[in-house]
């Protein structure tokens, strides 16, 4: 009996058919498509423990396009009920509906800056990066630049990943400023990786003469990753006044590694 009820509920839930007024055996049946209660069920499915329910609900909401923007924004505003999975899937579904929507773009930018939820801030940065790569998407907003100075290391790292994935080569000054002051190793690692992806080798070689030790070390690591420095250049860098840069430039077997001692 439980199995029969669950099966009937599944078909009713996903719009196969429903008896009019719930009367079994009735000839007239109503197909359920974009009714309000179905939207609520789809939103609930975004927070389901079953990945297939989340994926199917997201695809259906994206298919319905701009009509779902309001309900999804309401779902994100409902802080009391939001779990991480629902928050993540609702945000990404909203971002995928219209990558070129300036209103949504501004909303995600404000979330990066102001939201209480760390997860929602991180997801918003990822969505903005995805939109920047989309053929019809919008470029990264200045909110991403501000995120590079955030007190939370995970936000700084995600902002760097957004710059890297979007392929922005006009943000070098911001990345270099971060390299100059960054103390978190994971963020520093991400920063020189972003530098490597967005700046050509010759430009990074010029950064080896930068007055800021963190910039020199970041540029050096990115060039070592590509084996792009001649032995004589490494010998000069081995005399650097900053210990980590000098140590990284000294030949060793096995190699020193990607960051330093």
Residue spans for each PLM region:
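Long internal repeat-built scaffold domains in very large eukaryotic proteins
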Residues: 211-213, 221-261
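Structural signature of alpha-helical solenoid repeat scaffolds
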Residues: 62, 92-95, 129, 164, ...
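C-terminal substrate/ligand-recognition segments
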Residues: 4-5, 35, 46-66, 85-88, ...
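Beta-propeller domains with acidic blade repeats across secreted/periplasmic ectodomains
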Residues: 1-33, 37-40
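Alpha-helix N-cap/helix-start positions at coil->helix boundaries
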Residues: 51-52, 81-85, 117-119, 153-154, ...
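Alpha-solenoid helical repeat scaffolds
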Residues: 41, 56, 71, 86-89, ...
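Boundary/linker elements of alpha-helical solenoid repeat scaffolds
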Residues: 21-28, 51-58, 85-91, 122-125, ...
């Amino acid at each position: 009996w439980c199995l029969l009820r669950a099966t009937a509920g599944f078909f009713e839930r996903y719009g196969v058919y429903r008896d009019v007024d719930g009367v079994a055996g009735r000839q007239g049946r109503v197909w359920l498509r974009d009714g309000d209660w179905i939207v609520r069920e789809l939103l609930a499915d975004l927070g389901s423990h079953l990945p297939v329910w989340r994926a199917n609900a997201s695809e259906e909401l994206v298919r319905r396009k701009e009509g779902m923007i309001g309900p999804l924004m309401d779902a994100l505003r409902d802080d009391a009920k939001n779990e991480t999975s629902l928050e993540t899937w609702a945000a990404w579904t909203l971002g995928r509906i219209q990558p070129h929507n300036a209103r949504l773009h501004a909303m995600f930018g404000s979330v990066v800056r102001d939201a209480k939820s760390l997860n929602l801030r991180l997801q918003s940065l990822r969505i903005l990066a995805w939109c920047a790569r989309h053929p019809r998407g919008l470029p990264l907003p200045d909110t991403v630049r501000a995120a590079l100075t955030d007190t939370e290391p995970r936000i700084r790292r995600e902002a760097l990943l957004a710059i890297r994935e979007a392929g922005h080569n006009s943000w070098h000054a911001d990345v270099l400023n971060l390299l100059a002051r960054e103390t978190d190793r994971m963020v520093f690692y991400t920063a020189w990786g972003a530098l490597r992806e967005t700046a050509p080798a010759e430009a990074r070689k010029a950064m080896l003469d930068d007055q800021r030790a963190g910039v020199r070390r970041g540029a050096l690591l990115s060039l070592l990753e590509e084996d792009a420095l001649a032995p004589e250049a490494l010998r000069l860098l081995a005399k650097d006044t900053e210990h980590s840069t000098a140590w990284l430039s000294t030949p060793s077997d096995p190699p020193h590694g990607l960051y330093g001692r």
